[in-house]
């Protein structure tokens, strides 16, 4: 099975902590956010249970590549970055369509998302991707 975990850089308080660590020389730019790290870890647990591959995917500007690399460092098998300036200005429904297209392109069986900035608890983007693919959406799962 192929599990795709979507990642992005840390935001809000996580950025403040990441900036402090970067100034101390402990991490570089594009730090993986804690929620997305949990999404990658969930995908890794699924891979351990069912076999297959974990792909860390980002739909973001190139500076997010650091987050993709961190996802690989914690156990993702490979990473993919889809960077296009037109996507940066897209609304959440369009981003959901892009996520669905990327999931299809990668041959994903399951997509794992963390909350998306500007999204109401992440449900708009996830639901849009699920609707395009005809997949069920399980928002805010507490365990797998």
Please describe what each predicted stretch is.
Residues 1-144:
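N-terminal glycine-rich FAD/FM-binding segment characteristic of electron-transfer flavoproteins
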